[in-house]
Amino acid sequence: VILLSAAQSRELDRLSQTSYGIDSYRLMTRAGEAVASAVVQRWPEALAAGALVVAGKGNNGGDGFVAARKLREDGAPVSVLLLARTADLKGDAALAYADYVAAGGGIIEAADESSLANQHPGVVIDAIFGTGLNAEIRGSIHGVIEALNRFEVPIVAIDIASGVNADSGAVMGVAVRAALTVTFGYAKYGHVSYPGAGFCGALEVADIGFAAEAIDKISPHGRLIERAEAARLISPRSTNTHKGTYGHVLGVAGSRGKGGAALLVGRGALRAGTGLVTVAIPECVATIVAAGQPELMTEPIADHNGHFASEATIARLTDLIPGMNVVVAGPGIGTSDDTRKVLEWLIREGAAPDRPLLIDADGLNVLAPADPALFKAARGPIVLTPHPGEMARLLSSTTAAVNANRMGAAQRLAEMTDAHVLLKGARSVIVTSASAVRINSSGNPGMATAGMGDVLGGIVGSLMGQGIEPGDALTLGVYVHGHTADRLAARVGSFGYLAGDLAAELPAAFTEIVG
């Protein structure tokens, strides 16, 4: 599913008009009519109490006037509050207002929060701000949006919930909590990336007649990862193969009390189809790991206070790594000084053009804050997979700031490090370059449990080891991880399934995705 930025959306609109002769007011009319149609289809009974359209002075407000006119034509009671003067309306918005008034509609202009006091609609239509909003909402409109959110009726947002940044999903001070958003042509990043996704409600993408050829000129790089996208990345297996065909993954994981992390990395890699998996582990957890999964090969390494001893670890990895297709490092390794030395060495020496290095969990924490020079010195692809807390430490930020603009945080880390970045969480964000952003659609709250990230690291490492390039391995791995969890939740509910359960379910999930 294609995702557009606000600028790309404007360019699609402009090209449709200037290069392909599509009338701008016709586009506005179709947009407003699509909104009215969605309201009638979803809330016909609520419309008996009337629709309240709250409009701004721009084209989003113009769409609102069209929707109001269409609903009146369909027999619904309609009220319109304009958060500006009618003299402020320009262009197509002014034309839409004139057509609405000509059809017998009335408005309250220069409306504010107090104007809502006597309104008792069955449905509210948010036509305040569109996808162009890029500044904090303050003043009277802030109060209007807060008041709208107190209405106990469905709110339908036109194009995007007012207050949500279309490029990042960030909330610009305050945002309308919509039950439904009707957008036009293509979804935008802010519709599907949290926190904005939580304000937009259900998403309906209406075809209003943009020129199909225009999208090719825009060349959008954003994608919402759904099943078809994941299935495209799974190649059929030849009958004439052997275990070496499907790669050799090296996991560098575990410490005293966290041997399970190494096990889960290994299980994720094995269940995602890797031919061979070796886990390098501190000697203190070697027995536990070896007994936990007989298909894993183990490389016990001398430890220091329960963690990898740096000199012994680097010496052993120097011998091991040349025979590997990919390295997954970090889960459960702790944050000692020895660990830091191992991770820095891996970045400088472990990655190669044909051998990606994935760093997760403690491997990220011990490297925080991120040193751009260190990462940019790597000789091969680096993949970083932080959750919001780890991202905050890498960026010298806060978890709250990361969650307020998840896309921005992922893009910033990718730019700093030249790495492929996955920011985990609801609607995980993948950044493979400055312009290529992918957002995952699968997964559920049951995944908020220990070890899920370790399994994911194993899955993505497995896919890279099988020859899938890092960006696509992240795309497929994250989707499969979430889809597998969705299978479990459908069967047992979203409480209490474990990371190990997810690993065991992976083969069936891959088979289902391929169909």
Please tell me what each predicted stretch does:
Residues V80, G91, E109, E113, ...:
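Short amphipathic alpha-helical segment within the helicase RecA-like ATPase core
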Residues Q119-V123, I128-P220:
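Internal gly/pro-rich beta-alpha loop/helix module
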Residues I107-Q119, L317:
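Short acidic low-complexity segments
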